[in-house]
Amino acid sequence: IKLKKGRLEAEPVDSGINEMLASYGVSYQNSLVVDQYNFNTAFNMGNGMVMNMPYPFWVKVFKKNMDAGNPALDMIDNLLFPWTGSLRVEEENLGEKKASVLMSSSDSSWIQTSWDLNPRQRFMPQQSELRPHPLAVLVSGRFTSFYKAKEIPQKPVDNSSAVSSAPVPPQNETIVDGTEDAALLVISDALFITEDFARR
């Protein structure tokens, strides 16, 4: 998602890679995870008043919702996933690959499709909507390239340069059809690893 500066609103962003990810067995869902187990944060309420309150969009991932069999998670007790979407394992695209959910929200979480991030809105999910949602998925095994039998995509234009330039056609490049043994880690949130959130 893209946060709107100075406002508690967001808008969805198309990463351009979801079709490729889905072909490998995992896709990103363009919605927000809301969780009854969350982190507190302070909000400016106006007139110089600051209020500290629970914020359901700041999902708290507990140890029990992490893959106990993955040694990379051994030393982690909990994590903050702010304004996160969710992932879905695309079973029909896995083939012989294996997908493991490394982290998920609690069983008291649900999906919100609106982009209003106001902490004072009424959060009233139906009981039937509450369930865990995958936040990190590891896909491993033999991968067939998404670009197999396709034209090599052109490199994007660098719009930061003052000199305009056209897309650069690929030169002396080939596409690897696949790999026998690889791993792909997909995480639903890009902010959780940044300093401000990782140290909470």
Residue ranges, per PLM feature:
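Acidic, S/T/G-rich, low-cysteine, solvent-exposed domains in lumenal/extracellular/periplasmic regions
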Residues: 1-200
